[in-house]
Amino acid sequence: MEIETGRMRITERDKECVRFVVEQGFATIEQLWKVAWSDQKNSSYTYNRVLSLEKFGFLKSVKINDTTMKIVTSTPKARIITAESSAYPTPVQGVSKDLVHHQLHLNELRILFQEKGLKDWRSAECLAVDPTFRKLGSRHVPDAFYISSRG
């Protein structure tokens, strides 16, 4: 299903990309390429799609002093579109810029796990707003958890 917003057609891959950023907090172009467009020869197509998603208010660039990579985060508009199609509660706020490097490393783990067939990754941000998770009685929210192919 594609969604028209203004003059941009939001594709399933765009939504997958936006959902990843909403759930993880931040992502690099290279990571989004692995998530949604890895069948493309290189990440230049991803870069152009991300620029369009920025232009139409779904993503925004984040300036981090000690990195040269382009890093994006989600906007309220992105969180709304993700919440409409998510089976789980969606984070209502972004992640603190203090956690960018930590989140980028977690992204690499998530991508690796997904490539190995693991599914249903739930980030700390998603777990923190999920009332069913809080009922488990844990005092600490883990960085993430996932469900293996064996359940």
What kind of region is each of these model predictions?
Residues 79-86, 107, 111-115, 119:
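Short, charged N-terminal helix-start/capping segments
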Residues 90-106:
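A short, highly charged nucleic-acid-interacting micro-segment common to nuclease
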Residues 17, 21, 72, 105-106, ...:
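Long, contiguous hydrophobic alpha-helical segments, chiefly transmembrane helices and signal peptides
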Residues 1-93:
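Nuclease-adjacent, charged terminal/linker segments that flank catalytic cores
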Residues 62, 101, 110-151:
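Active-site metal-binding core of divalent-cation-utilizing nuclease and nuclease-like domains
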